[in-house]
């Protein structure tokens, strides 16, 4: 009895080797304690070590892709050695679909894995960027100000067009703009199994390639048992989310079917910035012992009131005279000026026409197949098709009929050359192709992967005038412009990883990519389009990982990436500037990783050196498409930290930080000067060693989690983002101020008879009511050598809340 207090306070360990039935060890297997949030992975010899454990009863859970998850009940009285042999899985796991393009513990790549549980506890109906906001170097923004509708994400200062997104290994980025439109897939987070974020170039993948990072998404994996879920959220700005999820579980251990139906509505923080979003997800799969066939169909429909004009600086500051001057410069009508003067400082929306909306529907079809031929050779492939169609509608005052290819009209006793009108600008596109990957494990220390993809995109761009004050002889269905964009994208890659000694893992990754992009027809300004460019890219990557011990390793890598210009780089090109060129990136990464029971730590440094980088100039066109221009030499260098530590059974802390220097060696700024005769000339200004636009020097995040009793968790989330310049002149009169925002998340899980789980959740965003802007734009014009600069900002909501009630059956 005297020894009992000593025993209960003692710290013990569990260690051992994880192997398969043939006695071959399994490096990379996951070992965790049931009911605990920490775990470890096996080293190159299949060894694991759980330390600093109190005496007591534990359930050890061991999992590895392709093998059955095993649980072992243990009574811990002293240091324990527990060797475990895993049996092959009775069916092939869905993870094989994404393995070819993912990083792992041996990869010399900077990455972070985000589990289904982490996604779901932060899923209150906001778009995926806001759910991923607590990861290193990430900055998010919302046009409507509250995370629903049009949202954006940047990683290491790079916008969405430089973040390569794949869903089950299939490219998601729009082929022409290279952007990511999460509004087209509302509540997609409810159908995600896990996400891997790779920062920097990362591994070879399918799509246009990463210039800042990659999001590798795997959708829902099968549940062992049948289930039903009903998830509901209501909150500020009349935000409402309803989600129904159903699944059969495994039928005869071979078949599974899953489905989801969602709707999200929100009025938005910005005036009239309402969203009406609907989506569904259906999946059916056959699970053989050595093969997997899965069919996915998912779709999103959105109707979003436009809020992409931003707020003029004078309105944001409440500067009445500045607003009057701005109205005069813009040629506002009296009604438009009064609307500006009488709106809220932080909620102003220039659009007032009731149907000034963006309307789009997108349907995705995926057929995924994987085959494990033996313990050395496996194969997976996918066929996919996406069709999308939609338009945005606009009311326009006093438009020249000639801009729409229309003749003058006789009306009101005079010849009318201008008219008020309503127009629709359409996009109708198709995207289809195939991906594949072969994996050959020659021996325990040597692995080969060969894969690639071929995809085609066909896009139609056209406009219609559906109403005019002075109607012409044209019909509503007539197109006043017609443009096409055709893109063929082929890539193939080979990867090899080799461990010459136990502690060292080397890799080489070689990719060839060929792109043909053809633009034809006329654009929205009735200009002729005729581009037909073919690009050939070679993207090599090399790296090494050295394991210091079971818990820690060092890694370093060198990668090359190339990327073609997007459609807007051609169509937004200013008169007198050269055609856009493809850009190249040399990325150097080095880091240290440490993982044990309670502490998970990653630190890394990076250098990203660009040739001909296409950089935001700070301007946008009338549809919020950003202007970009090539700069000869530029770079991003930085330090990143990602850590989590379990302080006790009640407290845990997560922290991340990114500190960077983002510079352009020589930057030429172009300002358009308008002459009295209607001609345009360019005024140039030269700058040296300026900061790259939208690239904060510091991004710091943290989360303190408190679990006082079973089922309840509270998390205080904090985010600091340093100042960002709106353009590349490093002018303090054109910047976003630094901001520090804190959110509070509460969750309580409990059970009642007949219901497996009930979850009550509360998310209070911006609890200290920080007034901040996360995005903006700027442009300058000149007349008689007098330059005028206009700044616009996207204000984010103050304190707001989302309350959720979720049921699992």
Predicted regions and their residues:
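Extracytoplasmic beta-strand/coil segments of soluble accessory domains associated
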Residues: 129-171, 193
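Gram-negative outer-membrane beta-barrel transporters
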Residues: 607-609, 629-728, 806-808
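A beta-strand signature from Gram-negative outer-membrane beta-barrel systems
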Residues: 84, 186-229
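Membrane-embedded beta-barrel scaffold of Gram-negative outer-membrane proteins
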Residues: 376-384, 545-547, 553-559, 581-637, ...
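Transmembrane beta-barrel wall of Gram-negative outer-membrane proteins
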Residues: 234-265, 270-309, 313-318, 367-374, ...
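Short acidic/polar hinge/loop motifs at secondary-structure boundaries
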Residues: 51-52, 120, 171-199, 218-219, ...
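C-terminal beta-signal and adjacent terminal beta-strands/loops
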Residues: 653, 661, 720-725, 748-809
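Short, acidic, small-residue-rich periplasmic hinge/interaction motif at the N-terminus
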Residues: 19-21, 29-34, 63-67, 77-121, ...
């Amino acid at each position: 009895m005297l020894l009992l207090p000593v025993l209960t306070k003692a710290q013990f360990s569990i260690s051992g080797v994880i192997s398969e039935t043939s006695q071959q060890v399994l490096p990379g297997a996951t070992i965790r304690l049931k009911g605990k949030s920490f775990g470890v992975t096996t080293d190159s010899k299949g060894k694991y070590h759980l330390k600093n454990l109190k005496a007591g009863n534990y359930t050890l859970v061991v999992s590895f892709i392709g093998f059955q998850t095993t649980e072992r009940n243990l009574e811990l009285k002293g240091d324990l050695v527990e060797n475990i042999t895993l049996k092959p899985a009775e069916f092939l796991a869905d993870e094989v679909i994404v393995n070819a393009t993912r990083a792992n513990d041996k990869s010399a790549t900077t990455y972070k894995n985000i589990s289904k549980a982490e996604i779901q506890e932060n899923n209150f109906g906001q778009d995926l960027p806001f759910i991923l906001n607590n990861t290193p170097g990430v900055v998010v923004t919302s046009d409507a100000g509250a995370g629903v509708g049009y949202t954006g994400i940047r990683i290491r200062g790079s916008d969405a067009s430089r973040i390569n997104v794949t869903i089950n290994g299939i490219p998601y980025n729009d082929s022409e703009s290279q952007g990511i439109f999460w509004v087209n897939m509302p509540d997609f987070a409810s159908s995600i199994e896990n996400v891997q974020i790779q920062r920097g170039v990362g591994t070879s993948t399918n799509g246009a390639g990463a210039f800042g990072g990659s999001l590798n998404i795997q959708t829902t994996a099968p549940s062992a048992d049948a289930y039903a879920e009903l998830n509901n959220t209501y909150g500020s700005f009349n935000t409402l989310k309803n989600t129904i999820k159903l699944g059969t579980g495994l039928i005869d251990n071979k078949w599974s079917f899953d489905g989801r139906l969602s709707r999200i509505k929100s009025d938005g923080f910005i005036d009239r910035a309402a969203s009406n979003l609907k989506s569904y997800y259906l999946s059916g799969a056959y699970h053989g012992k050595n093969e997997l066939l899965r069919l996915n169909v998912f779709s999103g429909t959105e109707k979003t009131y436009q809020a992409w004009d931003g707020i003029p600086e004078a309105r944001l500051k409440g500067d009445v005279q500045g607003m009057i001057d701005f109205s005069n410069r813009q040629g506002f009508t009296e009604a438009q000026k009064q609307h500006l003067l009488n709106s809220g400082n932080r909620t102003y929306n220039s659009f007032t026409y009731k149907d000034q909306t963006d309307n789009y529907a997108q349907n995705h079809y995926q057929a995924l197949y994987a085959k494990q031929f033996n313990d050395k050779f496996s194969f997976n492939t996918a066929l996919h098709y996406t069709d999308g169609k939609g338009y945005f509608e606009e009311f326009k005052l006093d438009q020249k009929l000639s801009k729409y290819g229309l003749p003058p009209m006789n009306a009101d006793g005079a010849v009318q050359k201008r008219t008020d009108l309503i127009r629709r600008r359409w996009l109708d596109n198709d995207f289809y192709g195939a991906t594949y990957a072969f994996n050959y494990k020659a021996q325990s220390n040597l692995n080969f992967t060969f894969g690639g993809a071929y995809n085609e995109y066909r896009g139609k761009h056209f406009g219609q005038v559906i109403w005019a004050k002075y109607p012409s002889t044209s019909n509503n269905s007539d197109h006043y412009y017609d443009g096409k964009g055709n893109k063929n994208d082929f890539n193939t890659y080979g990867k090899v990883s080799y461990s010459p000694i136990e502690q060292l893992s080397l890799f080489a990754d070689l990719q060839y990519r060929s792109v043909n992009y053809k633009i034809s027809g006329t654009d929205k300004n009735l200009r002729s389009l005729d581009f037909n460019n073919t690009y050939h890219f070679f993207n090599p990557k090399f790296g090494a990982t050295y394991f210091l011990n079971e818990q820690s390793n060092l890694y370093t890598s060198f990668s090359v990436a190339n990327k073609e210009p997007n459609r807007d780089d051609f169509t937004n090109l200013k008169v007198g500037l050269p055609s856009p060129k493809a850009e190249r990136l040399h990325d150097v990464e080095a880091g240290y990783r440490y993982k044990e029971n309670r502490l998970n730590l990653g630190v890394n440094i990076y250098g990203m050196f660009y040739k001909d980088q296409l950089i935001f100039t700070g301007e946008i066109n009338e549809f919020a498409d950003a202007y970009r221009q090539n700069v000869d030499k530029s770079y991003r260098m930085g330090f990143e930290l990602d850590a989590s530590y379990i302080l006790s059974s009640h407290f845990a802390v997560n922290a991340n930080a990114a500190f960077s220097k983002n510079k352009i060696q020589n930057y030429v700024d172009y300002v358009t000067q308008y002459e009295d005769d209607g001609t345009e000339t360019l005024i140039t200004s030269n700058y040296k060693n300026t900061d790259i636009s939208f690239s904060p020097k510091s991004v710091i995040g943290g989360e303190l989690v408190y679990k006082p009793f079973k089922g309840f968790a509270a998390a205080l989330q904090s985010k600091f983002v340093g100042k960002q310049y709106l353009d590349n002149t490093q002018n303090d009169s054109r910047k976003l101020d630094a901001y520090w925002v804190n959110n509070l998340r509460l969750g309580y899980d409990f059970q009642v008879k007949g219901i497996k789980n009930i979850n009550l959740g509360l998310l209070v965003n911006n609890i200290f009511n920080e007034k901040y802007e996360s995005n903006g734009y700027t442009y300058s014009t000149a007349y008689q050598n007098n330059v005028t600069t206009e700044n616009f900002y996207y204000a984010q909501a103050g304190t707001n809340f989302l309350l959720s009630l979720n049921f699992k059956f």
